[in-house]
């Protein structure tokens, strides 16, 4: 009842019973009762009750008149507080809002029906509450509105509050006494409000009961724990039961168990866990009989067989000869259905995997019961000591045990699948957990900026499409910005987009450009129904991160005569386009579209029937995104997945991942996230892990040696000063890292690429690679090869600590294999590794350092790196091998004429250009990187697991979680990573794609590209040559590159190849060749800055600057002078005396750059300079001592500097052992290796000509002197000794010098004249091996080579391969002249046989002397094999040589020289002596022409041992 319905105002106008009696209406009522109107049909008692009700509740009908005391108070209040009435009205408005909220709640609760279609505990609860709950809101609202109206009326009438009598008629003014909602509510007697006193009392009682109950439970548990128990198992009966159980177990079948290697060893490879493909078997694993499913009876004796599943009770009647595989498939399906319905569990199936077969003849005879269980090939047979075998038939149903006859009544009744089943009703529960992240991750935020108007809305991504509202494109002439979980993209012109409206609905489908990464296509769409409960799913695109949001659920109802449906979920402006999702099945029902003007109802556009098949999943849309090969399901990951993907065993991490807001307890120290606070655009924070900025620089500072040298040498300082200061230490600070990382935050421009031409460019590049010899690549799964290619000095990863060298220090081969397998599994499953971001500590140009620009490095973690190398290493290695043959230089060496080949590959007379690219790694779009993935997949072997790994790897490369130094894990959406396994190769391919795309866009056919443009790429470096007729190409390249997002300029054009800069080098002409040269300033920076930790490292750095300076003659001369000065300082002079100071001769540098040998003329000129100061009286009586002492006036020639000092620099050598002083030899044979850095000595009293085995002759000339001729850089420059700096003089006394040759030699003479030419002897230093008679002369060796090549009928190139195999075969089997038959060489896994006879027929003098020519190479080959793993030739194994350091000498054609160590010489001689012991060489064979008929005069008795031996009492006779 509504108390406001009680009449009050006009009651005084009602006629009383007394008045009615006067008018003739006789009423049996009290005269004072008033009747509103008289109707004779109404009973009199009703009039009486109405009046009694009015009288009893007249106070409830309104506010009534105010008593005089209250009126005075109110009047005083109104006079003193002018804001009392507005404040009271504000309180009444608040109460009205509260009551209307309650009223909406009651209406929503009562709108839920408990029908059969919506029967749940929730609906039952709501129905009960709606039945018993009382709604006072309507009455309260009426009271509040009346009070508010009366107050406003009083205010509008402007009544003077000083007259209390005027106030008494306004009862609502009682509210001005109260200043709170509770006070006003109590004054107006509003119903349905909480009684806080009663609530407090009930809560106190409940807490007391809860505490008492907890105490009772605790007391019960405490008493239970104190209760004493005893074991009852150790008694006779229990022991008897255990014996019975053991006996029962003994009757069970037994199975052979072992690891793969053991099983393969005993039974064959078919029993390993590789799979059930047929493999080799051996021993008991080989079976001669056929596999049968039934045995011991004839199935044809029975009419049919009934198969029974003991778990489900289902039966199947079939022919006795039915294929058992079909039966097994049938019952597997039945059991899967039961599993899905939770009627059985997997444990049931594991404990009872078999079925039972009943072979039945007729219904009156006994049936044959047979147990069928899955076949186990390793089960031990019951009757024989062997295994069951047949591993290819594993898990197939087969008879187990002997068949048993059973009575007909024991046969189960038929229970075929599909019979009618009746199930019990179960209670309906609330719906369980549901993951809405797949929907939230597909939501995009769309901004359409057209002129000055900007519209913001949401959309839903599906493949290459976005579904959104049509009213987004009220204007379609602007720029569309798309913010998604893929990143931030920009479409410059919305008119280029293809749009498909959904007829009659506020829905439109946008087809994205082809270079937009596709979304996952896992969403489900359907039409809504009235029974659905819906929620609103959204994504909160913040500046620094993206998070998912979800609303409460709401009912939904259709709007008449439209395709809109209404919902009651609160929304805001800009929420249009968010998906409405059904909580019943997770399907998307529509997109939020409209709201009414009062924001009390919202509307969404519903999807039509078959929306997905009609508009989304058609063939045209599938073809639109088919070129995308990366995994779209692994793109929209966030913090939750990152924590789930934390590496597990065998990887061991030492840092934990946390959420961004996961720190509930913290120290009150100020923590600044200096990077996270600046994130924007395509960089989003997804997590946190401990990190710090490494500011320790590898460059320690300025080199004090170099500074001291310049301070003490003014002329040299004038030379070096202009070249110094151009390079500085890179800045390692927070701002530098933020500046470099924020390059990745720029939006990705899509729609600018001509995708048709770009896809054509990909096909052209693939065809080019095939034509150049690029073949199929493999996935490298060999752990040894993977680990050998790792940089063990690098860090393990962001979540790890230490270097790889320490992490894998004690790891076995099996553990390494497990690491590779685990990494591949993570990659296959799409688990992300956390990459480490850091700043590069290096020398950078001064301008970039002043601008605080430092390059960052993003390193792959070990858990991703190993699997990544499995996928990319073989492709990369083949890529390196084709350098310069294809348009790239990756893998080439700039030395040995490599740079000359590069520049000469650019045609002469063309227009050249070195393109300048900037911000390359951060500007690469996902579309470009996906093209690289397509190229790689085109050449990889077919392996579905490998393809998935490779796709996931490149998905992780694009969408990378990077652990930054401030502790934030950042997700990027574009660009390449500098620390991924194939950065250079991928960058090179992308630049090649850009060049091919540009030429195709310019209209040139692929067959004409090389005729008009030649180019080479290395990473982001690009050098081009264009035919003069097509010079205009340069004007268009920048535009086409920018379409792909690449920032390149092509303005530095030239006609001179020497002006080209490529990879920071330019080519200068030297001795007819182009040699690579760095900037002089960059070379001087090596001297200027010190990063070495040991003195020897500093010397190596100076030598490195010498290598780079060759070609700058003046600079090289000054560096050699500096190096010579350094070797005189401590502690470098001690290193020099110990032979540890590296030194590089001029001839070595010439060989390194030009790959040309030093001429004998150059060497002779050096020797002439060495002996040019000998006097005439020494003409015949001269010997050579190596004291190297000179007169004061003699000139000293030093290869280290043009000025003479006492420091001597010998030539380069490949061995650390010097020749004896009594021997001065020069060996000119070619070595297998040619090192640059070699020991040098600075002892002033000894000069030795080392025994060199390099191809570089010794050099005694002054290197880099400006007076030398260009074509004879090793010419001798005679310089006078500076007597003021003579190390041989002390004070005014001169130390006497010995002559190099003395006249006291006794020479052989004829007729009193010496018969030897000492001048020739001084120059005659032949190689020791050339004179040795253990090596065949060169003419014999050449004759042998030609004869063998002719007999084998092969070419010189084929012969070079055969000789490799012959040398290795002879290392193993020796070079004995008694060998015969065939010798073998391996071609992969195949043996190739060659006859030995031609080798021996042409070998003069002996085959061993021929093979002595291969001694040096064989020694190096054995050393190489030992570097890979322990290797001992068969020759050493037979002699039981245990020292592997001597393995290089363990072959019988080893050639001993004076450089052979004494220990090695002794070991080789001992092995040779052991091999030749008891060997007999017969001078004559058996003469077949001599007669053998003669009389045998020997006499033997029965006591003789045999016919050739006499015996006398056990003793041998003579």
Curated annotation (Swiss-Prot):
Residues 426-644 form the Peptidase C4 domain. The modification O-(5'-phospho-RNA)-tyrosine is found at residue 295. CDD domains: ps-ssRNAv_Potyviridae_RdRp (cd23175). The record marks 179-180, 232-233, 425-426, 668-669, 1186-1187 as: Cleavage. Its EC number is 3.6.4.-, 3.4.22.44, 2.7.7.48. The active site is at residues 471, 506, 576. One of its GO terms (molecular function) is nucleotide binding. GO terms for biological process: DNA-templated transcription; proteolysis; viral RNA genome replication. Transmembrane segments: none annotated. A motif (Nuclear localization signal) lies at residues 273-280. Residues 1239-1272 are annotated as: Disordered. Residues 910-1034 form the RdRp catalytic domain. It catalyses: Hydrolyzes glutaminyl bonds, and activity is further restricted by preferences for the amino acids in P6 - P1' that vary with the species of potyvirus, e.g. Glu-Xaa-Xaa-Tyr-Xaa-Gln-|-(Ser or Gly) for the enzyme from tobacco etch virus. The natural substrate is the viral polyprotein, but other proteins and oligopeptides containing the appropriate consensus sequence are also cleaved; RNA(n) + a ribonucleoside 5'-triphosphate = RNA(n+1) + diphosphate. InterPro entries: DNA/RNA_pol_sf, Peptidase_S1_PA, Peptidase_S1_PA_chymotrypsin, Poty_coat, Potyv_NIa-pro_dom, PP_Potyviridae, Rev_trsase/Diguanyl_cyclase, RNA-dir_pol_C. Keywords: Capsid protein, Covalent protein-RNA linkage, Host nucleus, Host-virus interaction, Hydrolase, Nucleotide-binding, Nucleotidyltransferase, Phosphoprotein, Protease, RNA-directed RNA polymerase, Thiol protease, Transferase, Viral RNA replication, Virion. Residues 1239-1258 have a biased composition (Low complexity). One of its GO terms (cellular component) is host cell nucleus. PROSITE patterns: POTYVIRUS_NIA_PRO, RDRP_SSRNA_POS. Belongs to the potyviridae genome polyprotein family. This is Genome polyprotein.
């Amino acid at each position: 009842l509504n108390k406001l319905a009680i009449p009050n105002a006009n009651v005084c106008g009602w006629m009383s019973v007394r008045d009615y009696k006067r008018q003739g209406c006789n009423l049996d009522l009290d005269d004072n009762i008033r009747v509103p109107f008289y109707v004779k049909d109404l009973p009199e008692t009703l009039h009486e009750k109405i009046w009694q009700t009015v009288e009893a509740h007249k106070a409830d009908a309104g506010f009534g008149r105010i008593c005089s005391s209250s009126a005075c108070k109110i009047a005083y209040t109104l006079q003193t507080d002018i804001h009392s009435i507005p404040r009271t009205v504000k309180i009444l408005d608040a109460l009205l809002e509260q009551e209307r909220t309650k009223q909406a709640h009651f209406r929503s609760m009562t709108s839920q029906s408990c029908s059969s279609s919506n029967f749940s505990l929730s609906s039952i609860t709501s129905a009960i509450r709606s039945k018993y709950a009382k709604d006072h809101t309507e009455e309260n609202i009426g009271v509040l509105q009346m009070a508010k109206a009366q107050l406003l009326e009083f205010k509008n009438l402007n009544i003077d509050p000083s007259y209390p009598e005027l106030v008494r008629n306004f009862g609502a003014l009682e509210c001005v006494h109260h200043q709170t909602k509770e006070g006003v509510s109590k004054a107006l007697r509003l119903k349905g409000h909480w009684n806080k006193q009663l609530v407090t009392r009930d809560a106190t009682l409940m807490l007391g009961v809860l505490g008492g109950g907890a105490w009772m439970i605790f007391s019960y548990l405490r008493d239970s724990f104190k209760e004493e128990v005893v074991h009852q198992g150790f008694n006779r009966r229990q022991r008897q039961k255990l014996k019975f159980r053991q006996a029962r177990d003994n009757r069970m079948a037994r199975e052979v168990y072992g690891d793969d290697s053991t099983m393969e060893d005993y039974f064959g490879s078919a029993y390993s866990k590789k799979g059930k493909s047929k493999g080799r078997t051996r021993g008991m694993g080989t079976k001669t009989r056929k596999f049968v499913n039934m045995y011991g009876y004839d199935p044809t004796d029975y009419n049919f067989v009934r198969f029974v599943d003991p778990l489900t009770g289902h039966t199947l009647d079939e022919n006795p000869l039915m294929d058992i595989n079909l039966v097994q498939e049938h019952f597997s399906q039945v059991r899967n259905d039961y599993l899905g319905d939770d009627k059985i569990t997997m444990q049931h199936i594991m404990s009872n995997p078999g079925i039972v077969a009943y072979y039945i003849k007729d219904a009156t005879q006994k049936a044959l019961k047979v147990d069928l269980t899955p076949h186990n090939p390793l089960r031990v047979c019951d009757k024989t000591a062997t295994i069951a075998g047949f591993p290819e038939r594993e898990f197939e149903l087969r008879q187990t045990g002997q068949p048993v006859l059973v009575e007909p009544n024991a046969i189960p009744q038929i229970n075929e699948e599909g019979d009618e089943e009746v199930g019990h009703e179960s209670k309906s529960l609330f719906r369980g957990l549901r993951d809405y992240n797949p929907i939230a991750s597909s939501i995009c935020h769309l901004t359409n900026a057209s002129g000055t108007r900007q519209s913001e809305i949401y959309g839903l991504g599906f493949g290459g499409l976005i579904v959104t509202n049509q009213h987004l494109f009220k204007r379609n002439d602007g720029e569309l910005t798309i913010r998604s979980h893929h990143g931030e993209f920009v479409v410059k012109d919305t008119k280029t987009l293809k749009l498909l409206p959904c007829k009659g609905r506020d829905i439109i489908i946008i087809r994205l450009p082809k270079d937009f990464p596709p979304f996952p296509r896992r969403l489900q769409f359907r039409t809504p129904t009235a029974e659905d409960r819906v929620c609103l799913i959204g994504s909160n695109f913040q500046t620094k991160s993206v998070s998912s949001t979800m609303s409460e659920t709401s009912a939904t109802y259709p709007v008449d005569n439209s395709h809109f449906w209404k919902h009651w979920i609160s929304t805001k402006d800009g929420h249009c386009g968010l998906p409405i999702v059904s909580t019943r099945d997770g399907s998307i029902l529509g997109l939020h579209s409209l709201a009414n003007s009062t924001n009390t109802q919202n509307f969404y556009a519903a999807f039509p029937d078959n929306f997905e098949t009609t508009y989304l999943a058609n063939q045209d849309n599938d073809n639109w995104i088919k070129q995308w090969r990366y995994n779209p399901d692994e793109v929209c990951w966030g913090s939750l997945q990152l924590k789930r993907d934390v590496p597990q065993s065998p990887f061991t991490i030492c840092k934990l991942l946390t959420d961004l807001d996961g720190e509930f307890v913290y120290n009150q120290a100020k923590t600044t996230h200096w990077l996270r606070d600046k994130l924007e655009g395509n960089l989003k924070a997804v997590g946190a892990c401990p990190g710090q900025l490494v500011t320790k620089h590898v460059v320690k500072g300025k080199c004090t040696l170099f500074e001291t040298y310049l301070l003490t040498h003014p002329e040299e300082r004038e030379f070096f000063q202009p070249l110094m200061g151009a390079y500085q230490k890179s800045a390692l600070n927070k701002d530098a890292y933020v500046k470099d990382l924020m390059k990745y935050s720029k939006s990705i421009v899509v729609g600018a690429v001509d995708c048709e031409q770009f896809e054509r460019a990909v096909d052209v590049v693939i065809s080019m690679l095939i034509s150049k010899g690029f073949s199929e690549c493999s996935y490298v799964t060999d752990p040894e090869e993977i680990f050998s290619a790792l940089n063990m000095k690098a860090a393990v990863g962001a979540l790890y600590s230490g270097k790889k060298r320490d992490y894998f220090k004690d790891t076995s081969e099996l553990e390494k294999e497990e690491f590779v397998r685990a990494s591949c599994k993570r990659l296959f499953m799409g688990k992300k590794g956390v990459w480490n971001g850091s700043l590069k500590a290096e020398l950078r140009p001064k301008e970039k350092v002043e601008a605080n620009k430092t390059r960052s490095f993003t390193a792959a973690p070990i858990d991703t790196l190993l699997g990544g190398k499995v996928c990319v290493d073989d492709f990369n290695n083949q890529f390196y091998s084709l350098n310069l043959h294809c348009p790239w230089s990756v893998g080439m060496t700039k030395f040995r004429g490599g740079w000359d080949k590069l520049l000469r590959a650019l045609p002469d007379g063309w227009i050249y250009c070195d393109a300048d690219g900037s911000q390359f790694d951060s500007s690469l779009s996902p579309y470009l990187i996906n093209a690289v993935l397509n190229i790689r997949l085109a050449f990889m072997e077919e392996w579905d697991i490998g393809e998935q790994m490779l796709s996931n790897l490149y998905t992780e490369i694009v969408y990378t979680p990077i652990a930054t130094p401030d502790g934030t894990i950042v997700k990027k959406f574009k660009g390449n990573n500098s620390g991924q396994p194939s950065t250079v190769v991928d960058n090179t391919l992308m630049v090649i794609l850009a060049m091919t795309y540009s030429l195709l866009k310019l209209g040139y056919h692929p067959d004409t590209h090389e005729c008009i443009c030649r180019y080479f790429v290395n990473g982001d470096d690009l050098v081009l040559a264009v035919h003069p007729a097509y010079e205009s190409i340069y004007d268009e390249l920048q535009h086409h590159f920018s379409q792909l997002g690449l920032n390149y300029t092509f303005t530095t054009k030239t006609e001179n190849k020497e002006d080209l800069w490529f990879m920071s080098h330019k080519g200068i002409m030297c001795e007819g060749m182009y040699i690579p040269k760095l900037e002089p300033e960059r070379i001087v920076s090596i001297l200027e800055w010190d990063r070495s930790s040991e003195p020897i490292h500093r010397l190596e750095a100076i030598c490195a600057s010498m290598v780079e300076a060759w070609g700058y003659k003046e600079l090289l001369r000054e560096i050699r002078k500096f190096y010579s000065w350094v070797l005189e300082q401590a502690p470098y002079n001690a290193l020099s005396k110990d032979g540890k100071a590296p030194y590089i001769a001029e001839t070595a540098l010439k060989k390194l750059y030009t790959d040309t040998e030093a001429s004998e003329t150059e060497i002779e000129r050096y020797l002439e300079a060495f002996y040019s100061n000998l006097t005439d009286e020494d003409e015949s009586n001269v010997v050579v001592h190596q004291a190297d002492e000179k007169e004061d006036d003699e000139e000293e020639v030093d290869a280290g500097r043009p000025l003479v000092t006492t420091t001597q620099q010998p030539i380069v050598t490949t061995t650390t052992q010097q020749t004896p002083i009594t021997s001065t030899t020069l060996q000119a044979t070619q070595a297998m290796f040619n090192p640059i850095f070699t020991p040098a000595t600075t002892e002033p009293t000894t000069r030795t000509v080392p025994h060199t085995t390099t191809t570089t002759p010794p050099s005694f000339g002054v290197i880099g002197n400006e007076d030398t001729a260009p074509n004879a850089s090793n010419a001798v420059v005679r310089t006078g000794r500076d007597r003021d700096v003579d190390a041989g003089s002390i004070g005014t006394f001169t130390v006497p010098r010995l002559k190099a040759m003395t006249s006291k030699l006794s020479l052989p003479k004829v007729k009193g004249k010496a018969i030897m030419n000492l001048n020739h002897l001084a120059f005659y230093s032949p190689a020791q091996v050339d004179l040795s008679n253990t090596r065949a002369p060169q003419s014999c060796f050449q004759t042998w080579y030609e004869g063998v090549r002719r007999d084998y009928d092969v070419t010189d190139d084929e012969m070079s391969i055969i000789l490799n195999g012959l040398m290795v075969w002879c290392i193993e089997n020796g070079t004995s002249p008694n060998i015969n038959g065939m010798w073998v060489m391996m071609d992969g896994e195949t043996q190739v046989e060659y006859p030995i006879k031609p080798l021996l027929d042409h070998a003069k003098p002996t085959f061993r002397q021929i093979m002595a020519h291969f001694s040096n190479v064989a020694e190096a080959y054995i050393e190489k094999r030992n570097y890979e793993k322990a290797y001992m030739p068969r020759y050493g194994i037979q002699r039981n040589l245990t020292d592997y350091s001597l393995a290089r000498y363990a072959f019988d054609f080893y050639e001993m020289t004076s450089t052979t160590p004494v220990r090695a010489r002794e070991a080789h001689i001992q092995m040779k002596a052991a091999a030749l012991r008891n060997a007999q060489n017969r001078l004559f064979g058996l003469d077949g022409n001599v007669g053998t008929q003669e009389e045998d005069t020997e006499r033997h008795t029965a006591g003789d041992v045999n016919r050739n031996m006499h015996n006398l009492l056990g003793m041998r006779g003579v």
